Regions:
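Extended catalytic cores of very large enzyme megasubunits
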Residues: 1-719
Length: 719
């Protein structure tokens, strides 16, 4: 029949019946009927069938669907054993949305798009073989984690592993621009190249001289950051993966940059077309000093990056504004202008109300918690990657006189619901570290040498989590309650412990550590101080019950790990980051990331299809009270949960604030009226800062007409 000739299918209609209650009952069984119909009408008749996995592999290699090299690293008998092992796990999709997303977005199809060449088991099979790189034991371990949905590789890794005609295994990058035309030109080229391969790109513009600054002694000659933003926006628009998907980028600017107001104004709905950016995302880098000046209702000075670099000999990004603020103010050689700190705070809140932007990076918080040598200066398209970077020096021939380091994000997620029933929590995490290590080792973005250089030195990855709200609801625990906060802390403590264990094992095996390990807090042992006190253990009876049977490291265990790390090092500079999850959380049938759900029955608008309804995982009469929408929740509860995880995460967490334009009565004690105000957002940002939150992603506002502001999720970076 072929997928393009499908007629009279019933699964969309059956799925849509979920949204039509009968006698007050949600028709959840209709989703199971839709799932069954999808396999019967779509998958089974349009899947190519092979007599054996050997025949399938031979066909896929001959037809140039999968690579040969990684298959040849294994014995033919092992390939059959592994495939049988995966089949024996009896994997089944739990919802129509999960199956639909997998077959629509991830399953390999014939070149004409008419037939499926892969099932979920096949995709897991090729992922495990590819990531294990010839090691049979590791291949079994990785397959075991993915097929039981304890581990989910990020979309680019899961989708492309093993394919002959594939994209990169990573799709998220960070680059820094310095204050010269060679760097600007090189960065534009980098953006084009990264967008071409489907990457979402974070760009730091804080080093660029402001509008009106001198160029070669000519006063008023510089155009500032806004024209450069327009160049980047046009680059992403032009380089769009053969017309399949618009490129995606975010530009970050320090709030003490003189162009900060002009920067924010580019996203306003009434902005002049000459300066307005429609598709580029905005982020602000916020030092502690800004919060202090706003709290005191004082004026703030904005400093010229050109004069700062001239005076101090380093780019603006590498000046600690909080530490040197008074010195910069007093220095007559530093150009500066004044604005009211609270006026800027209000401008940020206004724009977040209007567009969901800017993202916020609390840069001093991030650097205080950073255990490695160097400075974090920015984040990525989803605000969870926080890694040190070094600037480059480029001559007029476009050659690197000094090769800096930029960042690629190698991501994956644990599934909280399924991890909590893992037969061996530690072994599960260690298998994930092996899979992610392969991704970082095999990613070579040669078109952008600074990213390739940074990746080869740091060997970083970002393991995160999804399904927290699903797990809490199924355990009849309210999201944001003390038990939920305690659970989150212990869960992420375990992720930290076991990723450290395996990173140390790999460093010992290979005799290699990440660059400048000896200058890190891991090397001197101070990183472990908070753990060797023994404070991170379950305390409440409920949380003790949840972790019953799961190994919880004691102070002595942490001390032993500290000594091993001091002796043999760590292979990975960074290990943990919590990304926002898109399609992969649906495939895993759990809530996205670690934030609350937005709807008990989520409505998704799918291209060319229409609406698909997705009931929250484990939704039942018993769990409904625990599935409170994020839009009806005090955001301080969400911040508290994220703060508990942040304690253990060496990078960042993609924290979205969910607001209603009309805020429910009694939700926030300072509210006299229901209408959302800029003050509400300012209070919440300050609360997050005081709780140690490193970054804030979107502010999503649910408006009276049922629409959302700021909900246009970035696909390039969502995992």
């Amino acid at each position: 029949m072929g997928l393009k000739q499908l007629e009279d299918v019933t699964y969309f209609r059956l799925n849509n019946e979920i949204n039509r209650p009968v006698n007050g009952q949600i028709m959840l069984h209709k989703d199971k009927e839709a799932l069954d119909a999808f396999f019967k009408e779509n998958v089974v008749p349009n899947s190519m069938v092979f007599d054996s996995i050997t025949d399938k592999i031979d066909y896929l290699i001959k037809q140039d669907y999968i690579e040969t090299a990684f298959i040849k690293k294994y014995r033919p008998e092992f390939l059959e054993e592994l495939y049988q092992f995966i089949k024996d796990q009896n994997f089944q999709f739990k919802s129509f949305m999960a199956a639909y997303k997998f077959y629509n977005q991830y399953a390999l199809k014939t070149n004409d798009g008419e037939y499926y060449l892969e099932s979920m088991e096949d995709r897991v099979f090729f992922n495990a073989l590819y990531f294990a790189d010839g090691d049979e034991a590791i291949a079994i371990d990785i397959a075991n984690e993915i097929i039981h949905q304890r581990y989910q590789p990020a979309t680019p890794s899961f989708l492309n592993a093993g394919r002959a005609r594939r994209g990169e295994l990573v799709s998220c990058f960070l680059i820094q621009v310095t204050d010269d035309m060679n760097s600007i030109g090189r960065s534009i080229n980098s953006a084009l190249q990264l967008s071409r391969i489907g990457g979402g790109v974070g760009i730091s513009l804080s080093n660029l001289r402001e509008a009106g600054a001198p160029i070669k002694g000519y006063e008023g000659a510089a155009s500032g950051v806004v024209p450069v933003m327009k160049l980047f926006e046009d680059s992403f628009s032009y380089s769009n993966q053969l017309g399949q998907r618009q490129g995606a980028g975010v530009v970050y600017l320090n709030v003490f940059h003189p162009d900060i107001i002009a920067f924010l104004s580019t996203k306003k709905e009434n902005a002049d077309e000459k300066v307005r950016v429609k598709t580029l995302s905005l982020g602000v880098v916020v030092p502690d000093k800004f919060y202090e000046l706003a709290r005191k209702n004082e004026e703030m000075y904005l400093f010229s990056p050109y004069s700062v670099e001239k005076e101090y000999g380093v780019p603006f990004n590498y000046i600690d504004i909080t530490e040197k603020y008074d010195e910069l103010v007093a220095n007559p050689n530093i150009r500066k202008t004044k604005i009211k700190a609270r006026d800027l705070e209000t401008e940020i809140s206004k724009l977040q109300q209007e567009s969901g932007y800017p993202y916020v990076v609390n840069i001093d918080t991030a650097n205080r918690a950073n255990p490695v040598d160097g400075k974090i200066i920015m984040s990525n398209l989803c605000s969870e990657i926080l890694q040190v970077q070094e600037p480059s020096l480029i001559n007029d021939a476009q050659e690197f006189l000094q090769m800096g380091t930029d960042v690629s994000c190698n991501l994956g997620s644990t599934n909280v619901v399924n991890m909590m029933t893992s037969p061996d929590f530690g072994r599960s995490i260690r298998a994930m570290v092996r899979a992610l290590t392969f991704v970082t080792d095999s990613s070579h973005i040669v078109a952008v040498p600074t990213i390739d250089h940074g990746n080869s030195q740091a060997h970083t990855f970002g393991l995160g989590a999804m399904g927290l709200h699903s797990y809490l609801a199924q355990q009849l625990i309210e999201y944001g309650s003390p038990e939920s906060v305690e659970f989150t802390s212990i869960y992420f403590m375990l992720l930290n412990y076991w990723t450290l264990v395996e990173s140390n094992n790999i460093a010992r095996e290979r005799g290699i550590t990440f660059h400048n390990f000896e200058k890190s807090d891991y090397a001197n042992g101070s990183y472990f101080d908070k753990y060797t006190s023994g404070q991170f253990v379950p305390k409440s009876d409920r949380v003790k019950e949840l972790f019953k049977g799961i190994f919880i490291p004691s102070a002595a265990d942490w001390a032993e790990l500290r000594d091993k790390v001091k002796a043999d090092g760590l292979y990975h500079q960074n290990r943990l980051a919590v990304a926002p999850n898109g399609s992969i959380s649906y495939i895993n049938d759990v809530s996205a990331s670690i934030h609350p759900i937005t709807q008990r029955i989520e409505e998704r608008q799918e291209k060319k299809i229409g609406k698909i309804y997705y009931p929250a995982a484990g939704l039942s009469t018993e769990t409904i009270p625990y599935y409170t929408s994020a839009y009806d929740m005090d955001m301080r509860k969400v911040i508290d949960v994220y703060a508990a995880a942040t304690e253990h995460v060496d990078q960042g967490l993609s924290l979205t604030l969910f607001m209603r334009s009309d805020i429910p009565t009694g939700l926030y004690e300072w509210k006299k009226e229901n209408k959302q105000t800029t003050r509400d957002l300012s209070i919440l940002r300050n609360y997050a800062f005081n709780k140690g939150i490193k970054s804030i992603y979107y502010v999503r506002t649910y408006t009276d007409d049922g629409g959302e502001v700021g909900a246009n999720q970035c696909e390039s970076c969502v995992i």
